[in-house]
Every structure is written in structure tokens, then in C-alpha cells.
A protein has these predicted regions:
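Conserved, well-structured interaction surfaces
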Residues: 84-160, 190, 208-211, 369-376, ...
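Short, surface-exposed recognition loops and adjoining beta-strand edges that mediate ligand/DNA contacts
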Residues: 34, 38, 62-80, 124, ...
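Bacterial Sec-dependent N-terminal signal peptides
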Residues: 1-33
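TPR-repeat structural position
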Residues: 196, 241, 398-400
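Membrane-proximal, proline-rich intrinsically disordered regions
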Residues: 22-72, 309, 316, 325, ...
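Extended ligand-binding clefts on enzyme/binding-domain cores
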Residues: 194, 238-239, 245-249, 253-369, ...
Length: 510
């Protein structure tokens, strides 16, 4: 079944895990008409629970959104003999009918549709409440839904739109903005400027509604701090440097809730607090992580890097870290041993290589024979330090001293000792780019970074892959410049052809 943007009814099935569709023209037997759905406090709570459940999808943070932006670029190499998982992205053969391109688009708009449904109904439910406690809870839910909708639109903008340039954004294509659930809306793309402004509008509502008292590390729910963290990220993408600094600082200064966890302090059994974040999905610096449990989880982030459960004897990685990435980690950088381990593979060529073990899997899940499943952590405090450092360097009056302090603070928590760094006009973009790789490796930032930096980074030369040991010959010598139209994913073909669609395609659709 092909998915589209518009949904005309609310399906209550599998915890409300539904998507939008443009090819269904009648109500299924399992559906509840819109005017009969979400009538009570309990209904509202169930709807929000369903939205969070949808966010576990392997098309999103537990899979495609996290992995493809880094696999597509220069951070990994496909191994000779690999399973061809994500092969079209590795080869830059990205088509409008590509299943990953369709899945990400459908999953994000599916969540947006459910958010719109909730927002359409919630005022009527709040008006019927007589207990202040329930009103407060519903208002909190509403803030969470605004934050979720903003997050989903921000992801669509990352994948399916050009990088934001304030000078041209008004004339560039954004995304189709769906504000309502029942009210008909044209299937037409807004400008890039208006699309980003809509995200900011939702974030401002979330920031106003969400009570900071509910902030807390390891939260499976949207919080006030998460809204500010997303605001900082979006502002960075928009080149609104002061705004990015303001919101990143808002998060960083909440040090009673969040702190950078040290890789140089033991937590237990030889494992550091930083190791604990990846081995047990517990960290004081995680602002929001998808709400996985051993009985309810999404994709397995570590699968393509290990594939140990093929025969439970050898590793069969589809992708291994690029040598140049491994070389970025200098002596004393404890992230190296937290992220990588040299292991033998089961391939005939016998490759032995530092494999990515960052996503080896939560130890509690492994004890239940669930392999390579790590809870996605889309918002960590570390990213806020990186955002603020870059914004401090790129604002009208750069503050390289302040930026150096931010990077040094992050690195001092990741190194056995030392870690300080000094930024200047000459080296800041290379240093920040490298630190973003070291810290955020395989967390889904590289594609957007290359796109938004453009000529600032490596003169716009982008990257060139150079074959490494046992790498797949096809794709290992690709060169991609920063202005390559394929940095923007194509709009799914079925959206262009859907009845009533006025959606304009991207250059990469050609």
C-alpha cells in the first residue's frame, strides 16, 4: 500500500499506530469516525501514547533517520560480500521509488497526521474537565504534541529540502505543511522560509506550555528542555546564530537536570558513565530517548554493523568505519574504545577491522536474546555544546574563546586527561566538523552538515571515498561535492502522482 499525506479517519488499532494514506477511499472496518474518536481524558492519553509508539518505527530514529545520513556519506564503507542493506544509498542511486525514501516520508507524515488529530480534538476535551489536575496533564500532553510535530517537520526539512540560506529561503521549496486533520488543505509545498517558521511556531508553543519541572534525564517524553534543544538545532540550520546560542545555553545551564557524563570516571565493573549510556541506555546527559523496553522496541541500530546473530559465531558487518574517521580519535580519547572494537569477521576474505560496537546492544536486551538493539538518543547534551560552539564561531562578532571553552568542556569529559582545544578563524570549521564526527558518529548528522556547510567546509569539495581493505569496489571511489543535488532526497513518486497533488518535485527526482 502506498502512503501519502492526507488521512480522512482515525484508525484505532495496534496502539493507534497508523499512517497517512492517499489511496484509501473508504473507511476500513477497524476505523472509528473522526467525530466519534477521542472524546475523553483517557482517549487523549491513548492518542498521545499511540503517537509515541509510532516514534519507535525502524523508519525513524531506530533505523533510517539515524543511519542513512551517515551511511550515505563518507563515514563508513560497505564490505565486500555485504547483504546490500541500504545499498542504494551507499551507491548514491537514490530514486523517488526507493523504499527508504518512501518509508521515512510516510512515517513522519503519519505522526504529523496523528498530532493534528490530537490538536483538533483537545480543546473540547479540556473544556469538559472539572479537575485541575487533569487539565494540567492534558496541557502537558499538548505541549509534547507540538514538540513532536515540530520535530517531524524538522526531519522532513533535513531530508527533502535544500539547506537553509536566509538570502534565498523565501524562494526555495519547503515541505507540504499540514496544520489540520479534518479541514481540507492543498497538497502544495510551502516555501523553505515558511516551513522553518512553522517549526519555530510549534516550538514556541511547546516551550510556553511544557513545564520545566518535568525536565529530566533519560526522558522517553518530550520536555521543555527537548523543545529548547530542537530550537537550538533548527536555529543553527537557519544560520540564526544568536538564537542557536540562546536555546543551547538554556539547555546547558539546566545543570541540575543534565550533565555531560565522564568517560574517565568508572561507573561499575570497569565500565565508565559514558559506556553506561551505550550499554544500558542510561545517562544524565540524554535529554530524550525513544521509549524502548524489552517488550516494546523498534529497529536494531547495530544490525548492519555487526550481524552477529547471523550464526552467533562470527560478525558479518555490512558497513565498517572509514579509516579516516578512526584516525580522528587521538590517543587518550576514550570514545574510541566505547565506539569501536577490532573483531574478526566471518567473511571468506577474513576481514579484521575496528567494528562499530556503539550499537552492540543494550545488555538487558541481550540477556533476553534481543541483539543489536540500542535505544535511540536523538537529543543529547553533547550536541548542545557543539551547536553553541559553532554558533559562537559563526555569529557576526565571533567568540572563539567561548567556543573553545565549549569544545574543551566536552572533550575533557571524553579524554583520559586533557582534551582542551583552541579555535580560531582559520581552523574552527574543520575542528568543529571533526568533533561532531567523533562525538555524534552514526547518529545521523553528517548529510545535513555537509549540505548546510557548503563551501565553508573543504571549499565545497564535499568528500571522496578511497577504497580500503575489503571494501565493496562499487561505491568505494565516489566523489560528492557539497552542491550535488542528491544531497536532497527525492520526493516519493507516489506523492507526486497522488490524486489532487500539486507537489513539486526536487532536482534529485530527475
Amino acid at each position: 500500500m502506498k502512503y501519502g499525506i492526507i488521512k480522512k479517519y482515525f484508525v484505532v488499532v495496534a496502539a493507534l499506530m497508523v499512517g497517512a494514506t492517499s489511496c484509501l477511499d473508504k473507511m476500513p472496518e477497524s476505523a472509528i469516525p473522526v467525530d466519534e474518536a477521542m472524546q475523553s481524558f483517557d482517549d487523549a492519553e491513548q492518542t498521545v501514547t499511540g503517537i509515541y509508539s509510532m516514534m519507535k518505527s525502524s523508519a525513524l530514529w531506530s533505523g533510517l533517520i539515524t543511519l542513512l545520513p551517515d551511511i550515505q556519506t563518507d563515514l563508513v564503507y560497505a564490505v565486500d560480500g555485504y547483504s546490500n542493506t541500504y545499498g542504494q544509498h551507499w551507491l548514491w542511486n537514490i530514486r523517488s521509488t526507493n523504499s527508504e525514501v518512501e518509508s521515512v516520508y510516510a512515517a513522519l507524515y503519519g505522526i504529523i497526521s496523528n498530532c493534528n488529530f490530537y490538536l483538533e480534538k483537545i480543546d473540547g476535551i479540556i473544556a469538559k474537565q472539572t479537575l485541575d489536575e487533569k487539565i494540567t496533564i492534558l496541557e502537558q500532553y499538548t505541549g509534547e504534541v507540538y514538540a513532536i510535530r515540530a520535530l517531524c517537520y524538522s526531519e522532513l526539512l533535513k531530508f527533502y529540502c535544500k539547506a537553509y540560506d536566509p538570502a534565498t529561503a523565501e524562494n526555495e521549496l519547503g515541505v507540504v505543511i499540514r496544520k489540520y486533520y479534518s479541514t481540507p488543505e492543498r497538497s502544495v509545498r510551502a516555501s523553505l522560509k515558511d516551513s522553518y517558521e512553522f517549526v519555530l511556531s510549534d516550538l514556541k508553543k511547546a516551550e510556553e506550555i511544557l513545564d520545566p519541572d518535568y525536565d529530566g534525564y533519560n526522558s522517553p517524553y518530550m520536555t521543555n528542555a527537548v523543545a529548547h534543544a530542537l530550537h537550538a538545532r533548527v536555529a543553527l540550520y537557519m544560520q540564526e546564530w544568536d538564537e542557536a546560542i540562546e536555546h543551547a545555553t538554556e539547555v546547558i545551564e539546566r545543570d541540575t537536570h543534565y550533565i555531560l557524563v565522564p568517560a574517565n570516571v568508572e561507573w561499575s565493573g570497569g565500565m565508565s558513565y559514558f559506556d553506561r549510556m551505550w550499554n544500558y541506555d542510561f545517562s544524565y546527559e540524554t535529554l530524550w530517548q525513544v521509549g524502548f523496553t524489552t517488550t516494546s522496541y523498534g529497529g536494531a541500530l547495530g544490525q548492519v554493523f555487526l550481524n552477529f546473530n547471523n550464526d552467533f559465531t562470527y560478525y558479518y558487518p555490512d558497513y565498517v568505519p572509514a579509516q579516516w574517521v578512526l584516525d580522528l580519535y587521538v590517543s587518550g580519547d576514550l570514545r574510541y574504545n566505547a565506539y569501536f572494537a577490532t573483531l574478526s569477521t566471518g567473511y571468506d576474505h577474513g576481514l579484521q577491522w575496528p567494528l562499530l560496537v556503539k550499537y552492540y546492544g543494550n545488555q538487558d536486551y541481550i540477556a533476553n536474546y534481543i541483539y543489536h538493539v540500542t535505544t535511540p538518543k536523538p537529543f543529547r547534551l553533547a550536541e548542545q555544546y557543539l551547536i553553541r560552539a559553532e554558533a559562537l564561531c559563526r555569529k557576526q562578532n565571533p567568540d572563539f574563546s567561548g567556543a573553545s571553552k565549549d569544545l574543551s568542556t566536552l572533550r575533557e569529559n571524553r579524554f583520559a586527561s586533557g582534551g582542551s582545544v583552541s579555535l580560531s578563524e582559520e581552523n574552527f570549521i574543520e575542528e568543529i566538523a571533526n568533533e561532531r564526527i567523533r562525538e555524534l558518529y552514526m547518529e545521523g548528522h553528517r548529510l545535513q552538515d555537509l549540505k548546510r556547510w557548503g563551501k565553508l567546509y573543504r571549499g565545497g569539495e564535499g568528500f571522496t571515498r578511497t577504497p580500503q581493505k575489503s571494501s565493496l569496489s562499487e561505491g568505494s571511489s565516489i566523489s560528492i561535492k557539497a552542491d550535488d543535488v542528491r544531497l536532497v532526497w527525492p520526493i516519493p513518486q507516489h506523492e507526486l502522482e497522488a490524486p489532487g497533488s500539486e507537489v513539486v518535485k526536487n532536482e534529485s527526482n530527475n
